[in-house]
Amino acid sequence: MITNFDRTANWLENCGKQPGNPFDTSVQIGCHLEEFTEFLSTLRVDSDGGKLVIDRTIADLGWLANKIKSGAYMVYIPPHERTNALDALCDGDVTGNGICYLYKMDKRTADQRVLDANDAKLVDGKPVLLPGGKIGKPEGWKAADLTDLI
């Protein structure tokens, strides 16, 4: 069975992204932060103070993600922190899956649809690259429809 990790690794390789490339890893970190801000934007809180904190966090983290994705800032995980980073990334997967489970979201199917949509970003096996190295979307590309999975 091909895992989501394997599909993502193959997709990045097809896009010309290489393990150990400082620029590629920095852009990927920026993309990861951008996705987290998208998650934060879905949250609602029952206090004005909490809403302000979430809004500030979205603004600040979104700003940082854009700086990183554009190449204005280069970030990296130093070797002595990689075990901690791996643990945090795995914990992020576990807690994200837990949220989906508790909200009765069909994460298995959603993962496959999102990965299929990413595959559709390749045109004749080649990526559309944006300035800064982020993978773009070809004309006519559509995001995965997840509306029936919630």
In which residue ranges do the predicted regions lie?
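Flexible "arm" and connector segments at domain edges
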Residues: 1-89, 93-150
